[in-house]
Amino acid sequence: MARVTVEDCLEKVDNRFLLVMLSSKRVKQLFKGARPLIDNRGANKNVVVSLREIAAGKIGCEIGKKGR
């Protein structure tokens, strides 16, 4: 995947606002030292890494009783 777009991520997460929250939470985890779940040879910024992880289906979220 050369470029990641919002449309790629919206195939996995239906709501744009939820996508922003999910991505920002993952970026915070990456800044604190979490390892990327995808190959990051290009030394991409954490925001790009989080969006690529979402587009690849490596991370997601659950809404409702299961997600709490």
From Swiss-Prot:
Enzymatic reactions:
RNA(n) + a ribonucleoside 5'-triphosphate = RNA(n+1) + diphosphate
User: What InterPro entries would the database entry show?
Assistant: DNA-dir_RNA_pol_omega, Pol_omega/Rpo6/RPB6, RPB6/omega-like_sf
In terms of Pfam families, this protein maps to: RNA_pol_Rpb6 (PF01192)
Q: EC number(s) in its UniProt entry?
A: 2.7.7.6
Asked if the keyword Plastid belongs to this entry, the reply reads: no
User: What top-tier enzyme class does this entry carry?
Assistant: transferase
Which molecular function GO terms apply here? DNA binding; DNA-directed RNA polymerase activity
Which keywords fit this entry according to its UniProt record?
DNA-directed RNA polymerase, Nucleotidyltransferase, Transcription, Transferase
Any Gene Ontology CC annotation: DNA-directed RNA polymerase complex
Q: Which GO terms describe its biological process?
A: DNA-templated transcription
Function description: Promotes RNA polymerase assembly. Latches the N- and C-terminal regions of the beta' subunit thereby facilitating its interaction with the beta and alpha subunits.
Assembly and oligomerization: The RNAP catalytic core consists of 2 alpha, 1 beta, 1 beta' and 1 omega subunit. When a sigma factor is associated with the core the holoenzyme is formed, which can initiate transcription.
Q: Which family does it belong to?
A: Belongs to the RNA polymerase subunit omega family.
| Protein name as catalogued | DNA-directed RNA polymerase subunit omega
Q: Which organism is it from?
A: Geobacter sp. (strain M21)
